A protein has these predicted regions:
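Conserved MFS/SLC helix-loop-helix module at the cytosolic interface between two early adjacent transmembrane helices
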Residues: 66-105
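Cytoplasmic helix-loop-helix junction between adjacent transmembrane helices
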Residues: 110-147
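C-terminal transmembrane helical hairpin of 12-TM major facilitator-type secondary transporters
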Residues: 306-356
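Extracytoplasmic gate region of multi-pass secondary transporters
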Residues: 35-36, 237-295, 350, 354
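Cytoplasmic membrane-interface "Motif A"-like loop-to-helix N-cap segments
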Residues: 76-88, 303-316
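Helix-breaking motifs and short loop linkers at transmembrane-helix boundaries and internal kinks
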Residues: 47, 79, 100-106, 117, ...
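Glycine-rich segments within core transmembrane alpha-helices of 12-TM secondary carriers
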Residues: 140-164, 185-186, 374-384
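Symmetry-related core transmembrane helices of the 12-TM Major Facilitator Superfamily/SLC fold
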Residues: 176-195, 402-417
Length: 431
């Protein structure tokens, strides 16, 4: 009876929560990386050099870094429904305002403010999922949520490419319409969030009494093994002092450098082979489609075996190989194959990686620790794109920057092996 009840509850959680949070992340990721497509014409209009574009693209993560932890602590206090709704409307408005930048300084400012606006969203959803899904189902839940990122690229790339084919309308150019059109869903979904999200299992009217009782008891039992009697502030400070949190931040730094190097620079790398904006979007979508499939299958295997370490290490190695290959690839076929390695590798690593913090963090400590891992780790999203732009200005090509980012993924793999000796394994999910 317990296995049947568990299966019923997990099925309800899956269909009630995951499709909606995937939609939210789809919109979030599109708004943060569509600048890569805007750059096809925006850079010339604004006079942006590769270094300037890399700096502006990456400076998003400085704002993200500074406001991540406080944003997640507020979410833990006021609830996901209210805070995520606030995050969405703010980032939607800032993203739309990006259409009106007039030069490097305004470009930097709006990208920084977009990072401030989005701070708290990703780790907030990861925290939210940990408050609903039992540990044995957490990697698959995280994978489904994070699959929205490559899915956003797969679907959003052709859409962005098509928008970039638009003629000037009402005095606005193609890249300006790109920012405006793709910002609208975030503002609209803010109102849906207030209706669709439930703050905690205890408030879930859509669960039957026995389902709610089982879920609350299961999650409480898991937390009991991790929580101390420390208060909110003490729990948060303890997490920030935990060396495991710092090491995981460095691991995530490498994967973020790879992910956002792709998001910002892949369209420009593909475009240099002479493709139109629409053709660039179509080719950029191919690796992302495969990444969605790889991410979900890899996460299921991780949950089924209960193993996390090698499920992070091997994809990081594959992604590093792909980036290095892209550095010397001289045909579009080779570039797309290299990007497949990178996309599938980084996407596959993320879900097992994000299943690890909840094995040693809970409560306020989880809110602070997860936010810290995400905020420090996402600084890789600043360093990677900026390194590509700066080294392209210095060397005239993309190779040197791609090799640097590949090295950061190798470091992530080694750090995962080191921290994995502490035993990041959960009980295998029941068959």
């Amino acid at each position: 009876m317990t296995n049947e009840l568990q299966a019923r509850v997990v099925r309800k959680l899956t269909w009630r929560i995951l499709p909606f949070v995937m939609l939210l992340y789809f919109v979030s990721f599109l708004d943060r990386v569509n600048v890569g497509f805007a750059a096809l014409t925006m850079n010339k209009d604004l006079g942006l050099s590769p270094t300037m574009f890399g700096l502006g693209g990456g400076i998003f993560f400085l704002g993200y870094f500074l406001f991540e932890v406080p944003s997640n602590l507020i979410l833990n206090k006021v609830g996901a429904r209210i805070w995520i709704a606030r995050v969405m409307v703010t980032w939607g408005l800032v993203s739309a305002a990006s259409a009106f930048v007039v030069g490097p300084n305004s470009f930097y400012t709006l990208r920084f403010l977009l990072g401030v606006a989005e701070a708290g969203f990703f780790p907030g959803i990861i925290l939210y999922l940990s408050q609903w899904f039992p540990a044995r189902q957490r990697a698959v839940a995280a994978a489904a949520f994070m699959a929205a990122a490559p899915l956003s690229t797969a679907i959003g790339s052709p859409i962005s490419g098509a928008i970039m084919q638009m003629p000037a309308l009402f005095g606005l150019k193609d890249w300006q319409w790109l920012f405006i059109i793709e910002a609208i869903p975030a503002v609209v979904l803010r109102f849906v969030v207030l209706k669709a999200l439930t703050d905690s299992p205890e408030k879930a009217t859509w669960l039957a009494a026995d389902e709610k009782a089982w879920l609350v008891a299961t999650l409480r039992e898991e937390r009991a093994g991790r929580e101390s009697q420390a208060g909110h502030a003490a729990g948060a400070l303890a997490a920030l002092r935990d060396p495991r949190v710092w090491i995981m931040s460095m691991i995530y730094f490498g994967t973020s450098a790879g992910l956002y190097t792709l998001g910002l620079w892949a369209p420009l790398i593909i475009r240099q082979f002479g493709f139109s904006a629409l053709g660039t979007g179509a080719l950029n979508a191919i690796p992302s489609v495969l990444a969605v499939i790889g991410m979900v299958l890899w996460a299921r295997h991780s949950d089924r075996t209960g193993e996390r370490t090698w499920h992070v290490v091997l994809p990081c190695i594959a992604a590093g190989i792909g980036l290095a290959w892209a550095g010397f690839a001289d045909t579009i076929v080779a570039v797309v194959l290299a990007l497949i390695f990178v996309n599938v590798g980084i996407s596959a690593a993320k879900a097992p990686l994000w299943a690890m913090p909840s094995s040693f963090l809970s409560g306020a400590g989880a809110a602070a620790g997860i936010a810290m891992i995400n905020s420090i780790g996402n600084l890789g999203g600043f360093v990677g794109p900026f390194a590509i732009g700066w080294l392209k200005s210095v060397t005239g090509g993309y190779a040197a920057g791609l090799y640097v980012v590949a090295a950061s993924l190798a470091v992530s793999a080694m750090l995962t092996l080191a921290i994995g000796r502490r035993g990041y394994r959960t009980a295998p999910a029941p068959q």
